């Protein structure tokens, strides 16, 4: 997938992406991901 920092830049807020556990610990794999800003668009959350 495209990495947004290459052309678009980062936006607040960050979102949490949770993936199913890849092991038998039963723990969700959650990571903070930046929302991607499209060039020329301004979003005021």
From Swiss-Prot:
Keywords: Antimicrobial, Disulfide bond, Ion channel impairing toxin, Myotoxin, Neurotoxin, Potassium channel impairing toxin, Secreted, Toxin, Voltage-gated potassium channel impairing toxin. Disulfide bonds join 4-36, 11-30, 18-37. Belongs to the crotamine-myotoxin family. It is found in: Secreted. Monomer. Cationic peptide that possesses multiple functions. It acts as a cell-penetrating peptide (CPP), and as a potent voltage-gated potassium channel (Kv) inhibitor. It exhibits antimicrobial activities, hind limb paralysis, and severe muscle necrosis by a non-enzymatic mechanism. It comes from the Eukaryota. GO terms for molecular function: potassium channel regulator activity; toxin activity. This is Myotoxin-2. The keyword Disulfide bond applies. It comes from Crotalus viridis viridis. Expressed by the venom gland. GO terms for cellular component: extracellular region. Its main location: secreted. It holds the Pfam family Myotoxins. GO terms for biological process: envenomation resulting in occlusion of the pore of voltage-gated potassium channel in another organism. InterPro entries: Myo_ane_neurotoxin_sf (IPR023355), Myotoxin (IPR000881).
């Amino acid at each position: 997938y495209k990495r947004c920092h290459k052309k678009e830049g980062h936006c607040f807020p960050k979102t949490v992406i949770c993936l199913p556990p890849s092991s038998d610990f039963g723990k969700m794999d959650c990571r903070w991901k930046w929302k991607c800003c499209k060039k020329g668009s301004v979003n005021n959350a």
